[in-house]
Amino acid sequence: IQEDERGTYILNSKDLNMIEHLKELKDAGVNSFKIEGRMKSPYYVANVVNAYRRAIDNMDSLTPEYIQELKNELIKTSHRKYTTGFYFGADDKECLESTYPVQTHEFMALVIGDSDGQKVLIEQRNRFKVGDELEVLSPNDTFNKIIKVEKMENELGEDVQDAKNVQERLYLYTKLPL
């Protein structure tokens, strides 16, 4: 049993990650994939679904470089060490994890309105400021694009330098269609 400021943990299992073995699973007759989204953030679910969707859509032409790019996407969200479980026998006999989840990126905002070519309505989830760089997670061509926060306004049109109010709705100025 472990405890920290976020809660008590009795049995923490490693996170299953089969993204580099999807072709093998398909060849074995698997025709449907499921991710574990229970007790996960919307950012986690969106990021994992996005990575797996890209892998599935490109399954017949996956290169080692593209698989590594997708694996790099998966480590951005909060996760424990990865395992392939018992898919390949008992090589990874220790499925329990005693360390805490890690992540390299934070979920900053959710796009909630259409872009007008100059700005887009967002709902803030974590603090960021003018001058910060944000990476876009999207199912379209803006996937992985970096935008620099040049200007923000609240819904009254007032200038905002620091998005620090939880779930505040702001207009983020960007020429990138989001």
How should each PLM-predicted stretch be described?
Residues 1-178:
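Surface-exposed amphipathic alpha-helical tracts and adjacent flexible/coil segments at the periphery
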